[in-house]
Amino acid sequence: MNQLAKLFDRIIGKVNISLREFNFDAAQYLKYLQDYIPLRQLIKFYAFYGVTGQQPFNFHFSRSNLAGSYFLGNCKVDNAILYKSDIRGDELKSKGDTINYQGVDFTLDLDEKVRIQDSILVKTLVHNCSNDPANPELFLIKNAASTPYANIHGSLVEGCFLGPFATADLTRLHGCILGTYAYVQTGELWKQHVANGRIWIRNNNRFEFSYRFPPKVLDRYIHFKIGQQPSGIFIDFIRKRKEHFQRIFDAVNLEPPAMVPKSTSLSRYAVVRPKTQIGENVLVAQRAYLENAFLGNGANAQENCYIINSRLAGNNVTAHGAKLVHTRLAKNVFVGFNAFLRGTADCPLDIGKGSIVMPHTVIDLRQPVAIPADHLVWGYIQKPNDLKYHTLSLKKLAAVRRQKTIKTMKFRGNGAAFVQSFRHRIQHILEANGAYFDGKRHRGHAQQDQNISFNIIQPYMMGPKKGLFPTLDIQP
């Protein structure tokens, strides 16, 4: 057994110890990895890191495999297997920044760092910054395993397992299991098993939103069982377009498309297919896919987003993993993590100005659907009649003071606080992305991420360390 195989077993053991209360065996769920990602895959792909003149960076890699993964910012990785994952540290806090927690101000003494230890991340996005008030300078992922297309967004993850397309958003997780396509934004969870397809948002005692997909519906879109690879419509959709990414990762230098404005950032690791138009102050992240897409001024496409035969009018947030097909978004529409919005040429989807599509929403149309302006959208929609059970005007939601139940969607608490919280966050995302850049002020990712220098690193190709990457310290 070489050192990489021993590393795999070591990580599995640590995850299992952390989840022993659930009688959970990560090895059974991750057994497919040894077929899905055999050793030849782990030595086939290089890792790469980005350097800018504006983003602090300090990389440390030891006793790890980093095949196909991307790093930006301050990152420390020890005893880990990261396969085609994105560790994007462009929103980490800097030395001297001040944060406020429950009325108390803290000033950071150090630049914040992402630390990944004793973990397996497969096609996983890590982004944002630590939301742990006890450790504001450390974004920690430890003794954890995540499966394809999970998102770890501003979330401490310690001793956890994340299923396919699961999202941990602004939540500190300790000894938890996030089921397939589960989404949590709850502040903190200890020793909880969040069911497959559950969308759960909680803000202390102010409000709580909860919805769960019917299991039969969810299984068609993403299915994950012991010893099997993830399968379903989501996987088929991605696999169908996989070959287009191969060229951009194989090429050393690629000329950017001529139509990119100076105030826009288009990653050289994004796919841009014919008939695509990109406006000003737009951010297109690595592993995004655009085909016959119109992105108006201030729009964005984050990691693992697919925008096909669709039009975004402007100032649209398309969060990590969202997919839009034959969809028209009016201005200021928010589409959440891993949402799947698929119309057709005969059955397009229109979403009105200012509407909020909740994370992990599935709209897969059999008839044309038009969602009015300023509505909240969730759940599973195929035809216009579904809207009465899966949408609610933001005005009506803001009027809720105690609770609101619509079929399996349950909301309790202050509706106005919920709407205000979402509006505030969307505004922050647009500002961070540089949507409001006027040529001098309000710079963001769209302007700051334009001149990234990419550098590649490769693993040992033979011997007992085959598949491991050399220990590296990379400093300014």
Feature-to-residue mapping (PLM):
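Extended low-complexity, polyampholyte segments enriched in Ser/Thr/Pro and acidic residues
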Residues: 2-19, 30, 35-53
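Glycine-rich hexapeptide-repeat left-handed beta-helix
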Residues: 9-31, 86-141, 148, 152-157, ...
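Extracellular beta-rich repeat passengers
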Residues: 43-44, 49-67, 71-72, 76-81, ...
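Eukaryote-specific, low-hydrophobicity, charge-rich regions
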Residues: 46-47, 55-61, 240, 244-266, ...
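Short, conserved secondary-structure segments in the cores of folded domains
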Residues: 73, 112, 254-256, 268, ...
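Beta-propeller domains
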Residues: 261-292, 296-298, 302-303
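Transmembrane alpha-helical segments and their membrane-interface loop/helix boundaries
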Residues: 447, 452, 464-467, 471-476
